[in-house]
Amino acid sequence: MSQTPPPKDGKNPEAMEVEDAIDEEILKMSTEDLKSRTHLLDNEIRIMRSEVQRINHSATTLKERIKENTERIKVNKTLPYLVSNVVELLDLEDNTEEEGANVDLDAQKTKCAVIKTSTRATYFLPVVGLVDPDELKPGDLVGVNKDSYLILEKLPAEYDSRVKAMEVDERPTEQYSDIGGCDKQIQELIEAVVLPMTHKDRFVNLGIHPPKGVLMYGPPGTGKTMMARAVAAQTKSTFLKLAGPQLVQMFIGDGAKLVRDAFALAKEKAPAIIFIDELDAIGTKRFDSEKAGDREVQRTMLELLNQLDGFQPNDDIKVIAATNRIDVLDPALLRSGRLDRKIELPHPNEDARARIMQIHSRKMNVNKDVNFEELARCTDDFNGAQCKAVCVEAGMIALRRDATEILHEDFMDAILEVQAKKKASLNYYA
């Protein structure tokens, strides 16, 4: 086996590498200097080890303290909260520093809060608590500790339970195709309510503001509520259904509070659609009256006017109102800027009546010889609801004679039944 020949100067290559790695200053030092230098380094290592041990001990102590505080916070948060409202948030300047002391400009101002509890007591909190003060604003509902009054949690906004019940959770199943003879009205409703929510960019490109609200008016049974239900079914927005008589309350200010809470809930869950049925219950023309009930109804309408065209309008909230008596509504409700678009739903014509009866009988076992055009000619002055009643009554007549399908004669008998219940032309206006 061949061996590597030693270098000419007689030095080992490994020793040469070690010498190259050592600083020249150390190579020039004497043995005594090297010993003292090594002793100093040993002392520094000993000091650093003790410092590491001290830091580890401090970290362990802090972890235990954090664990204790976390358990204490958990215990405090499981206690029943005292419900309070934030009245005001203050920037408190700390001027207690001694003259000439170093001042931290970032920590010079601290956020403080003034709260009012459900016991009608008002407290000033120099320390807010567990909630970031930047997340709070006056009027927020918070849960505080009943002993220290520190804010433990921000609670959801409080709404009237009657307003929460107005939100439609289960979507209606109606579609635009279920409404016959109202193609123009459906198009106007889609343009005013649905398009601003689904295609907002088209309005921005044209530089126009969509209508804030829609008023549907016409005789009873012409499909006003059904159109609103179709809009609720076709849009993914929050849908609130209010009835005018619901807003007429016994106590002063109760109806106005319902209107305020309804719009506040719609603003929180925007985009939202508010449907007010039977608007004439609260929207009648204002007049001088000494009765407290009349004045309360007028106050409710004034709150509705304020929400429709208030100081802070919201384009993500659309209002659909329906009424049979547009002639008694207050002019302030009808002016532009509030209920901008008025959609009239008149009695259906002959073609519309035929279409309505075809829609309501499409799932029924109807004989192919049924002539809906002839039925439409026989149902003069019928509204949409009465046309639907004809289909239902025809099915009941066929059921009465144990038939498997509905004949044309059943529809004719049903028309006579509905006309007999009608007896005379009804007058819906006083």
UniProtKB/Swiss-Prot annotation:
Annotated Gene Ontology cellular component terms: cytoplasm; nucleus; proteasome regulatory particle, base subcomplex
Keywords tagged on the record: ATP-binding, Cytoplasm, Nucleotide-binding, Nucleus, Proteasome
Subcellular location: Cytoplasm; Nucleus
Major subcellular location class: cytoplasm
Binding locations of ATP: 218-225
Null mutant phenotype: RNAi-mediated knockdown results in larval arrest and up-regulation of the aspartic protease ddi-1, indicative of proteasomal dysfunction. RNAi-mediated knockdown in a ddi-1, png-1, sel-11 or sel-1 mutant background results in reduced or failed expression of the proteasomal subunit rpt-3.
A GO molecular function held by the record: ATP hydrolysis activity
Origin superkingdom: Eukaryota
GO process annotations (BP): proteasome-mediated ubiquitin-dependent protein catabolic process
Pfam families the UniProt entry points to: AAA, AAA_lid_3, Prot_ATP_ID_OB_C
Oligomer and partners: Component of the 19S proteasome regulatory particle complex. The 26S proteasome consists of a 20S core particle (CP) and two 19S regulatory subunits (RP). The regulatory particle is made of a lid composed of 9 subunits, a base containing 6 ATPases including the PSMC3 homolog rpt-5 and few additional components.
PANTHER family, per the entry: 26S PROTEASOME REGULATORY SUBUNIT (PTHR23073)
Described purpose of this protein according to its UniProt entry: Component of the 26S proteasome, a multiprotein complex involved in the ATP-dependent degradation of ubiquitinated proteins. This complex plays a key role in the maintenance of protein homeostasis by removing misfolded or damaged proteins, which could impair cellular functions, and by removing proteins whose functions are no longer required. Therefore, the proteasome participates in numerous cellular processes, including cell cycle progression, apoptosis, or DNA damage repair.
Family classification: Belongs to the AAA ATPase family.
Official protein name in the record: 26S protease regulatory subunit 6A
Gene: rpt-5
